[in-house]
Every structure is written in C-alpha cells, then in structure tokens.
C-alpha cells in the first residue's frame, strides 16, 4: 500500500508539473515569438515554414530610432503614465479612506462611483473629442492625463477601499481620541498600514494607462501619439513591417514587465491583505 501511495503521489506531481509547464508555454510563447520577431529580418518573419534558427539583426530597432523617432513616443507614454498614476493615487487614497472609515454610506457611494467605470470608453469617445477640440487640448499631455485619471479613479478607489477596510476601526478611534485630525490619521496611521495595497493599485493603474489605446487614438494625431498608438504606423500600403513591430512591441512591453517585477513584493503583499486572519 505504501508503494502504491508513493507512486500515486509521484504521478500527481508529474501531472501537475506537466500542466504548469504547458500553461507556461501557452503564456510565454507569444511574447517569446514577439521578441524574436524584433531581432529577425522581415523575410525571416513571414517565411513558411517558420524559421526558429536565424541570423539576429538590429535592423528593426535601427528603423525605430533613426527613421520613425520611436523614442519620443515612448517619452510621451512615460510622461502621461507617470503623472496619471501619481494623480490617481493622490485622489483615490483619501477618497477610499473616507469611504472605508469616515462616512457611513461608503457602500452606496462606492456603487455610484463604479457606475461611471461601467460605461464603455467608446460610448464617451465623441463627447471627449468634442470637448478637447473646443478647449484646444488635442495633441496635449493634459487631455490624455485628465481622461486617464478620470477613467482609472473609480477602479483605484474600489481597490484601495478594500485595503483600508482591513484596518480595524479602533485604530482610528484611538487616534481621534488622542487629538489627531482625520488627515493625521490618514497620513500617519492608515497610509503606512496599507502601503502595500496602494503600491499594488499603482501597478495596476500603471499597466492600464501605459497600454491605453482608445483615448490616445481619439485625442492625438500621427504627430504626437503614445507608443502603443504609434505602432499603427508600421502598417503601410506595402504591408506590415514585422521586424519594426516586434522591436516596438518589445520596447513597449519592457517597462511594464520591469515595473511589475520591481514592485512584485508590494503587489503580492497588497493582493493578499486580509487573506490571513
């Protein structure tokens, strides 16, 4: 019986290992293929059957920086993303704290806030474009930052409220009894306790803003787009420049992966808050 039990346990481990290997392959193969495409010649990319062994080249990256000036589009994305993340966290954190501990109608107000997030972006595309046109804000950082902040605030409030809810209300009551103001309670007591959750929220907002495409398409032109939108320019009447597409996709995805990797400790900490009592 002992031998049978050990064999069964070993078989299960092997099956689980095989399952996770297959799942990892499914997720990683598209990204790996994209990276390889950036280092291929255009002919190698469209050859049939596909070539897994090829002579690496930096022609795609050279085309990006010397012909298209892709670096300025990355700077556009970086400016919009960094400012948007800072503003979203700065606005959402106090609001989430208030909904969690200050007001007694936090649940009702949260539902009202989330209703704004339910509306699909394409439904407000025309009004946003008309408003930006009348205010002369097309092709500006301000327009992209404002719309990204407005779109991501409901999600950030919803997520951070759950983190603040994990802090026992007696801490706030004790601080208030000792003479602390609400702002002091928020900045000196609550924020350090939910820092992991706030940073986890910042990661999600960073990814959402960096990859945002719809409003960048509506509010910018071919003169000053963000990096994801600029990749449309590699589709010409003669075909798609796959080497440039692969190189651009690699450059666009690298900051997101690097940021998530750097913040992974806080990301896991934030997402597991309250899971252990």
From Swiss-Prot:
GO terms for biological process: transmembrane transport. The keyword Glycoprotein does not apply. Pfam families: BPD_transp_1. Keywords: Cell inner membrane, Cell membrane, Membrane, Plasmid, Transmembrane, Transmembrane helix, Transport. GO terms for cellular component: plasma membrane. The chain crosses the membrane at residues 15-35, 79-99, 109-129, 140-160, 189-209, 213-233, 242-262. Residues 74-263 form the ABC transmembrane type-1 domain. Coiled coil: none annotated. It is a multi-pass membrane protein. Its main location: membrane. Probably part of the binding-protein-dependent transport system y4oPQRS. This system probably transports a sugar-like molecule. Probably responsible for the translocation of the substrate across the membrane. Belongs to the binding-protein-dependent transport system permease family. MalFG subfamily. This is Probable ABC transporter permease protein y4oR. It comes from Sinorhizobium fredii (strain NBRC 101917 / NGR234).
